[in-house]
């Protein structure tokens, strides 16, 4: 198992300070620990609840891109399933990749930086891998009662509807990753 974990962290650092090099190697290992154990190991960063949020997903992908970019594409694609059709996103990550929860306690939250993380992560992914085709991948939109960028409630929505945006005839609506990016970037204006 030691060999396995050493292969997972395949980034080396060489500075004048061996302690700093070791620390940076440890930081590179954090995304693996987060995926296994959640964020509870960083209580001073408000992760003490043990949950993972929107930023966590994308920042983990950024870190993993340094070590294993080929396997990050599927994660990025699933992450876009947390975007709502109004450009906002689910704030809490459920169990497993691509499973989202609107929020923890019924309070609508729209964060200014949430559209930034998918954009810069996808950009780095494309630059690292050359996989521009990811922009064409079809992904569903997240749906819950929040609408109009968290300022209104969709009174027609209920749990039976599910958490995917649907068309008028009840089919799950999908849009390309590029569409998701554009909606997130432009809907705030």
Functional labels for PLM-detected ranges:
Residues 28, 56-58, 186-189:
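Generic detector of bulky aromatic hydrophobic side chains
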Residues 64-72, 76-189:
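Aromatic-rich carbohydrate-recognition surfaces in CAZymes
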Residues 56-66:
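Non-membrane alpha-helical segments in proteins
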Residues 1-49, 145-147, 152-168, 172:
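Acidic/polar, glycine-enriched structural segments that form the non-catalytic walls/loops
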Residues 10-39, 48-55, 79-115:
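Aromatic-lined, polymer-binding surfaces characteristic
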């Amino acid at each position: 198992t030691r060999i396995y974990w050493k292969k997972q962290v395949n980034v080396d650092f060489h500075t004048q300070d061996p302690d700093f090099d070791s620390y940076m190697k440890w930081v590179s290992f954090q995304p693996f620990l987060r995926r296994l154990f959640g964020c509870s190991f960083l209580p001073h960063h408000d992760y003490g609840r043990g949950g993972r949020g929107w930023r966590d997903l994308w920042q983990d992908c950024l870190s993993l891109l340094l070590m294993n970019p080929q396997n990050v594409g599927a994660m990025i694609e699933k992450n876009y399933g947390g975007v709502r059709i109004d450009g906002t996103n689910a704030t809490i990550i459920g169990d497993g990749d691509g499973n989202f929860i609107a929020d923890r306690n019924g309070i609508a939250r729209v964060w200014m930086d949430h559209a930034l993380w998918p954009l810069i992560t996808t950009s780095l992914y494309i630059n690292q891998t050359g996989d521009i085709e990811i922009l064409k991948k079809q992904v569903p939109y997240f749906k819950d009662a929040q609408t109009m960028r968290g300022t209104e409630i969709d009174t027609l929505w209920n749990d039976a509807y599910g958490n995917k945006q649907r068309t008028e005839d009840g089919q799950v609506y999908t849009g390309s990753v590029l569409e998701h990016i554009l909606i997130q970037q432009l809907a705030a204006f």
